[in-house]
Amino acid sequence: MESLLSSSSLVSAAGGFCWKKQNLKLHSLSEIRVLRCDSSKVVAKPKFRNNLVRPDGQGSSLLLYPKHKSRFRVNATAGQPEAFDSNSKQKSFRDSLDAFYRFSRPHTVIGTVLSILSVSFLAVEKVSDISPLLFTGILEAVVAALMMNIYIVGLNQLSDVEIDKVNKPYLPLASGEYSVNTGIAIVASFSIMSFWLGWIVGSWPLFWALFVSFMLGTAYSINLPLLRWKRFALVAAMCILAVRAIIVQIAFYLHIQTHVFGRPILFTRPLIFATAFMSFFSVVIALFKDIPDIEGDKIFGIRSFSVTLGQKRVFWTCVTLLQMAYAVAILVGATSPFIWSKVISVVGHVILATTLWARAKSVDLSSKTEITSCYMFIWKLFYAEYLLLPFLK
């Protein structure tokens, strides 16, 4: 650790450390909370021993920089040594929830819930179908799928701890908030609970959806001979397409159609469109997710399309694919025999296509922050599509 104290005094005060406002620079990285203490005298009792401290340019503030996004603003004086200790139990609980929230990759959780809700309503044929029986079937599918989703994203983090220290240092395994053993316990528990629920529900479409997702998610991430398919760009994209485009649409639709409603298998026009459209979207997500991660992927030998073809080319390929998908959706919506379906489908997809183009033109491809923000915007378009799908008839 390198430390530099110039023209400053450091004294112990009330169980903490007191720095007078002078130039202070301590160089050391660890798990840190972010604090901003604006005072000529600052008493700080950091949660962790080593902190990265830099003045904010005005000489009167102490900045501690974190490895994840949570920020706290604290004013403390020598007469308030308990400033960092109050409500410690509540704070510990909130921190635990925050760590699990980041571990679960919430954008995938939202996508899973919306996709299952949307395709489930594709099986609704009449108003009387909307009943407690339908919502019970949806709840069974959502809970089982969410637990499997946590297994898949958790296993990916366990396999990518070193890469995530470069690409996603805010994730709890990469930051050290979770130990490897904790991560293993979480993914093992959620996979077992997912299969248990799928089995007791007694729906074969649901159980096979969970099983195939488990197999593909494991093969995608785990570092074993002939596996860790994420190393190969085309195979990785096919895994994501299989789960997000095919399994989600068909298996969960059949869960409602055959298990909940007890009807024969029937592939409707909206289901076929949803599967085709989400195939495009899943390819885009598979390609786009690696654009901001190019630095770590290069270091650890992950041959993503962004590494081999370049960020700019992959970025505009993704935008073009989505615009093509929206054009097809507009044409399909325009052929609907129902006026209300035609209006909602056409207007909705025109708005989404226009919004995507405007956002893409504004992205600075040299900024990892902007690319990551645009990737999360792609997920919002993904959510919006699932809101539109039930209106396609």
Curated annotation (Swiss-Prot):
Pfam families: UbiA. Its EC number is 2.5.1.115. Pathway: Cofactor biosynthesis; tocopherol biosynthesis. Signal peptide: none annotated. One of its GO terms (biological process) is unsaturated fatty acid biosynthetic process. Keywords: Chloroplast, Membrane, Plastid, Transferase, Transit peptide, Transmembrane, Transmembrane helix. The chain crosses the membrane at residues 108-128, 133-153, 170-190, 205-227, 232-252, 271-291, 314-334, 338-358, 371-391. Belongs to the UbiA prenyltransferase family. Seeds and plants overexpressing HPT1 accumulate increased levels of tocopherol. NCBIfam families: PRK12887.1. This is Homogentisate phytyltransferase 1, chloroplastic. It comes from Arabidopsis thaliana.
